[in-house]
């Protein structure tokens, strides 16, 4: 019930934003429901979703220093050049998503950019991006539920990666 009220209140707040390109960043802890919330908001309000997972850092740029930074696994430079300059234009654009199965850039992802644009994923509100969004949403989750969701989504083997690497970096962020 609480999540339905949260969703309805958020959707109503977003409807009240001025009618131009409305940019909403959905950040939060892993497995907190960022992707699910973005999909529900698009279904309710329309718009585009840009996934921060599409900006995974390519292997050639992974240095120990970069990987030790909170958010260092995000290819900020590409997000800053391919997405941010285009968000307020009101014109369609595209960016290339990172394909983790090939560890290389993959298909072009079109963004209609004529209403709501939801930028979802961990580090979508990172200070390196500045204050590009009209609204910030941060989703929290308790540790037990987080572990259960990661185990279900990624499997037991990958859960250990999250517990030892990704969650500590997100907590530092």
List where the protein language model places each region.
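Conserved nucleotide-sensing/catalytic segment adjacent to the nucleotide-binding pocket
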Residues: 48, 61-105, 116
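Short beta-strand-centered segment that lines the nucleotide-binding/catalytic pocket of NTP-utilizing
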Residues: 45-60
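ATP-dependent NMP and nucleoside kinases share a basic, alpha-helical "lid"
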Residues: 104-153
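Conserved lysine of the Walker
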Residues: 34
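P-loop (Walker A) phosphate-binding loop of NTP-binding proteins
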Residues: 29
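Small-molecule kinase domains that catalyze NTP-dependent phosphoryl transfer to phosphate-bearing small molecules
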Residues: 104, 126, 155-173
């Amino acid at each position: 019930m609480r999540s339905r009220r949260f969703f309805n209140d958020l959707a109503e707040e977003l409807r009240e934003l001025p009618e131009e390109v409305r940019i909403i960043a959905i950040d939060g802890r892993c497995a907190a429901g960022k992707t699910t919330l973005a999909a529900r908001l698009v279904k309710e309000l329309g718009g585009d979703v840009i996934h921060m997972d599409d900006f995974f850092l390519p292997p050639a740029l992974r240095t120990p220093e970069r990987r030790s930074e909170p958010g260092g696994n995000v290819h900020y430079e590409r997000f800053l050049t391919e997405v941010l300059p285009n968000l307020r234009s009101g014109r369609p654009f595209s960016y290339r998503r990172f394909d983790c199965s090939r560890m290389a850039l993959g298909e072009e992802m079109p963004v209609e950019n004529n209403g709501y644009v939801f930028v979802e994923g961990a580090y979508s509100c990172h200070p390196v991006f500045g204050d590009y969004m009209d609204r910030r949403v941060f989703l929290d989750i308790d540790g037990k539920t987080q572990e259960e969701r990661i185990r279900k989504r990624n499997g037991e083997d990958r859960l250990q990666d999250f517990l030892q690497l990704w969650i500590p970096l997100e907590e530092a962020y």
